[in-house]
From Swiss-Prot:
Name of the protein in question: Cytochrome P450 monooxygenase helB4
Signal peptide range in chain numbering: 1-23
Job description of the protein: Cytochrome P450 monooxygenase; part of the gene cluster that mediates the biosynthesis of helvolic acid, an antibacterial nortriterpenoid. Protostadienol synthase helA cyclizes (3S)-oxidosqualene to (17Z)-protosta-17(20),24-dien-3-beta-ol (protostadienol). The synthesis of protostadienol is followed by several steps of monooxygenation, dehydrogenation, and acyl transfer to yield the final helvolic acid.
Keywords carried by this UniProt record: Heme, Iron, Metal-binding, Monooxygenase, Oxidoreductase, Signal
Name of the gene this protein is made from: helB4
SUPFAM superfamilies: Cytochrome P450 (SSF48264)
Regulation: induction: Expression is under the control of the secondary metabolism regulator laeA.
């Protein structure tokens, strides 16, 4: 036994030597730029994003290596919008197994399925309920839990402060509102997070994403005693699963006693049928999975985008003034602005949202795709079948071949330029774009429009980040972030404060 153990270092050394030799001289990706460590281990890229500033890390990779580089063994990252469209529009490319980590109790959602047939079937089932027409029928419910809830909260705080002004944490309030909204839509229940400043359900949802992600990337933590590290996250995950199952059961019991069906996403999921295979509906587990997926994917991303719009507008007061004037010149203070009115009458606001999606670090990761049957030539390099192709969103959004002065925050680049909008991939692209895109844009637009219509906003005098705090390029510094499933403010209690007063 001792003799065998003496050979272990030699075996490890020979294995490492072979891996390095293969990656540098024999791999089909050997001519593509990239770090040697990235070629040797997939954990290198993950740890680099988690331990450092994730968005800046992947931006730096694009700036150093260019439009294509190796970011993991048998995997490349691409950043040119034309290449990205080629991959996303090809039926040969599908999501990779990494999406398994967000499956719920073994069930893939429309956001995580790797099966093209299942993805198409689910789109046929629930896609009609997420178009502008059906969302318009749910807009009253969406308004109730987002715009009107924030208004009630801020008006109460202003009244308690004597009616002058009040400092709020806009990140918390936007997050509470979007979680309450998706909770009402996808579960048919009231979280009351914003009303009560209650983070209970939000902690369940945050723990769910964290628990599923860590289990996938660090499987050793599934085993005892290491599993104790994740115990609190597992318990919150299990509470969320139980809550979700209970929501489906409650709704089905309700339907047996009342005739009128509620107008929300939970009911849509229950009623959804595949037009190519009528009368086949989703099972209770599938309804639960889609409801949870909508909460995971929809609440966090929407609240973060909304918060980043506010953050960037306060850093660039000239754009805040323009978008506020656009809104107030067309709507009276008492008018509740709808999503249709936002789309028709507020092009500058829409431009600010698109520029936020391009400029801000909403996610620190990639969108990985793979084809097992089709090779592809990208930037002069042939990528054989079986190689993962990951879309570097940050590289695409600052790509010097596409954007003029990409390092600058400039919403005007989107005014009257539909091609610029097509070069933003925050919601993916084409027939495979995020199915919740319309809902997310509705929430973002109506919240920002109605807030700026009714309230004056400004930064507190002691804010660390503002127009005065600039970097070497003269740009206002954005608040520091931390990376998880999404990129969140690192110090929200310090950096997400806003002075709110009634419109003058």
């Amino acid at each position: 036994m001792v003799e065998i153990l003496r050979f272990i270092p030699l075996v490890l050394l020979l294995t490492l030597t072979w891996r390095i030799t293969y990656e540098l001289f024999f791999s089909p990706l050997r001519h593509i730029p990239g770090s040697l460590l990235a070629r040797l281990s997939s954990k290198y890229s993950i740890l680099k994003r988690v331990l450092s500033d994730g968005p800046q890390s992947v931006q730096a990779d694009y700036q150093y290596y260019g439009n294509i580089y190796v970011h993991r063994p048998n995997g490349v990252s691409i950043s040119h919008p034309d290449d990205i469209r080629t991959v996303l529009l090809s039926p040969e490319f599908r999501k990779t197994k990494v999406y398994e980590m967000l499956d719920i109790e073994g069930h893939a959602s429309i956001f995580t399925t790797r099966d093209p047939a299942q993805a198409s079937r689910r789109r046929r089932q629930i896609g009609p309920y997420l178009n502008h027409g059906y969302l318009g029928r749910m807009e009253g419910l969406i308004m109730k839990y987002s715009v009107l809830a924030i208004k009630r909260k801020w008006d109460r705080l202003l009244e308690e402060s004597g009616g002058q002004q009040v400092t709020v944490n806009y990140r918390d309030h936007k997050q509470y509102a979007t979680f309450d909204t998706i909770g009402a839509l996808a579960f048919g229940r009231e979280f009351n997070a914003l009303t009560n400043d209650d983070r209970t359900v939000i902690r369940w949802i945050e723990a769910t994403g964290l628990y599923l992600g860590i289990r996938k990337n660090f499987p050793l933590l599934k085993l005892w005693p290491f599993s104790r590290v994740l115990r609190q996250y597992r318990e919150r995950y299990e509470r969320f699963i139980a809550y979700s199952k209970e929501s489906v059961t409650r709704r089905k019991n309700l339907l047996s006693t009342v005739g009128e069906r509620p107008m929300d996403l939970l009911q849509a999921f229950i009623d959804a049928e595949d037009p190519e295979n009528p009368h086949v509906k989703m099972t209770a587990d599938e309804v639960m999975t889609e409801s949870i997926a909508m909460q995971l994917a929809g609440s966090e991303s929407t609240s973060f985008v909304t918060s980043w719009v506010i953050h960037l507008l306060t850093l660039y007061p000239q754009h805040l003034a323009k978008v506020t004037e656009e809104i107030r010149s067309q709507f009276s203070p008492s008018h509740l602005i709808t999503f249709a009115e936002c789309r028709d009458k507020l092009p500058y606001l829409e431009a600010c949202v698109y520029e936020t999606l391009r400029y801000s670090p909403i996610t620190s990761g990639f969108l990985p795709r793979i084809s097992y049957t089709k090779g592809l030539t990208i930037q002069g390099h042939y990528i054989p079948p079986g190689v993962e192709i990951a879309i570097n969103l940050h590289g695409a959004h600052i790509n010097k071949d596409v954007w003029t002065n990409p390092h600058l925050y400039d919403p005007t680049r989107f005014l009257g330029d539909d091609q610029a909008k097509r070069n933003v991939f925050a919601f993916s692209y084409g027939h495979r774009n995020c199915i919740g895109r319309n809902l997310a844009m509705m929430e973002i637009m109506i919240i920002i429009a109605n807030i700026l219509k009714e309230y004056d906003i400004a930064l507190p005098e002691d804010s660390v980040h503002g127009p005065w705090n600039v970097d070497a390029l003269g740009r206002p510094r954005i608040m520091p972030t931390r990376s998880a499933l999404f990129t969140t403010p690192k110090y929200p209690e310090r950096d997400c404060r806003l002075v709110v007063s009634r419109r003058q």
